[in-house]
């Protein structure tokens, strides 16, 4: 509840500042609003955890309750290939993985549930209809996430992607 109030307050203050003509929102203020938005409830708050919000197509990384990266926009599974919700753990990492199933490069792959992985793609995150179940990120975000994770870190996938 505190997280929800903090998020609502941060968004309201930023909106009031812009609408009321108080001035522009600076980088620090915008960052605070972004971080507050990342506080939408990630069910897991113990240790380092990747939070994947399917409903909003966002990913961020937390240490406990503190957001240390993101949120960033991601692209998850399309209809028939939904990214499976649940609490998973990174079990295998491959910097230069190539899918044997789809014969496609999957840079910065971090597998968390059978063949589903966090990895980079070279297309916009808004490209429909979605992935084959993986959590796609930009090359920049995938490289940053790669540096922050190791085998054993939690991956909490929650919500539901519209249309799946």
Q: For each predicted feature, which ranges?
A:
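Cell wall/extracellular polymer interaction/catalysis modules
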Residues: 2-21, 26-80
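Exported/periplasmic cell-wall-interacting domains
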Residues: 33-49, 78-87, 92-164
